[in-house]
Amino acid sequence: SRTVKPFTLLKSLSEIADLQTLQSLIKGLRVCCMQRVYGNNVYLSEIAQIYQPQTISSTELTEDGFLVYGANGIIGKYKDYNHETEQICITCRGNTCGMVNYTKPMSWITGNAMVINTDKYQDKVCKRYLYHYLSAYNFNSIISGSGQPQIVRTPLEKLKITLPTISEQKQKAIIFDKIQDKIDINHKVLNLYIGQKQYLLRQMFI
């Protein structure tokens, strides 16, 4: 009945708040763990090729094809791909500047993201470890631009990265992958609750 809908909505809002708190704690755990990593300090440019790929316009996106990564993660699909292997990419333009994504194999990455390509440095760095390391990094200090926020290549090249041995990196990557899996599951559940909240709000005013 309509009288119970407000209580159902309040329950949904409470569950959303709990999930958001849990997600924040999980992300904080990754940051805390990365701050306690010990190893050699190297510049990011010493272990990765850093570049912006060719941009395609939104009108070129297709319903089928290969995933396209832009300023907001996955933004659509395209008939071709410009990276055969999975890649780390950092949003370098707009309000999501500094967001780190790990792409699927055979994807197109646009010029709104900076690629951190470690394919030629596999003996030095574990790609998944570096992804988690950068995901825990606060990029605010290198974001520039008074109108549209942006990250340019030079300060990225000079980022100091702490690298344990390659075997330790792989071990840590496994642990952080489990944390990431928990974040991803919570994110999906959170989206379901948000959808439920929006539905209940609409129903209350019918």
Each language-model region and where it sits:
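Proline-centric
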Residues: 1-13, 34-37, 115-124, 136-141, ...
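Non-catalytic DNA-recognition/assembly elements of restriction-modification systems
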Residues: 2-70, 158, 163-166, 189-190, ...
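Glutamine-centric residue-chemistry signal
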Residues: 23, 148-150, 169, 196, ...
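PAS-family sensory domains
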Residues: 28, 32, 178, 185, ...
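Short, intrinsically disordered, mixed-charge
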Residues: 49, 132-139
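A short beta-sheet element
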Residues: 70-135, 144-147, 152-156
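Extracellular/lumenal glycan-associated surfaces
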Residues: 171-181
